[in-house]
Curated annotation (Swiss-Prot):
Family annotation (InterPro entries): Cystine-knot_cytokine, Glyco_hormone
Protein's recorded name: Glycoprotein hormones alpha chain
Sites where a glycan is attached: 80, 106
Subcellular location: Secreted
Stretch forming the signal peptide: 1-24
Domain of life: Eukaryota
Biological role stated in the UniProt entry: Shared alpha chain of the active heterodimeric glycoprotein hormones thyrotropin/thyroid stimulating hormone/TSH, lutropin/luteinizing hormone/LH, follitropin/follicle stimulating hormone/FSH and choriogonadotropin/CG. These hormones bind specific receptors on target cells that in turn activate downstream signaling pathways.
GO CC annotation: extracellular space; follicle-stimulating hormone complex
Main localization category: secreted
A biological-process GO annotation: positive regulation of steroid biosynthetic process
Keywords from the UniProt entry: Disulfide bond, Glycoprotein, Hormone, Secreted, Signal
Length: 120
């Protein structure tokens, strides 16, 4: 019975040390900061010319999962992994003219939706 108390004490000490270390880390230490949320960001290149031009930047979700066998049967080139994703795109925009005659889209609202143009 005495040996169980020793094991319980060791486990409690280990757990309390682990929790202390976990709480002492800065907030968001384990989150990826490479890809911010989907939002409007000023385009510095086109905004130099007077009128601020905004575009949607950031990340949405993507996931991959094994392709079901019945779906693989219908594929011309069967693939073992299926992936889905959504991209940060403009929900609303206005047309703007910069540099005299170049027409660009000035995004006014962003959301996550179907990816039309993939970056490699």
């Amino acid at each position: 019975m005495d040996s169980y108390r020793k094991y319980a004490a060791i486990i409690l000490v280990t757990l309390s040390v682990f929790l202390h270390i976990l709480h002492s880390l800065p907030e968001g230490e384990f989150t990826t900061e490479e890809c911010p949320e989907c939002k409007l960001k000023e385009n510095k290149y086109f905004s130099k010319l007077g009128t601020p031009i905004y575009q949607c930047t950031g990340c949405c979700f993507s996931r991959a999962y094994p392709t079901p066998f019945r779906s693989q049967k219908t594929m011309l080139v069967p693939k073992n992994v299926t992936s889905e994703s959504s991209c940060c795109v403009a929900k609303a925009y206005t047309k703007a003219t910069v540099m005299g005659n170049v027409k660009v889209e000035n995004h006014t609202e962003c959301h996550c939706s179907t990816c039309y143009y993939h970056k490699f």
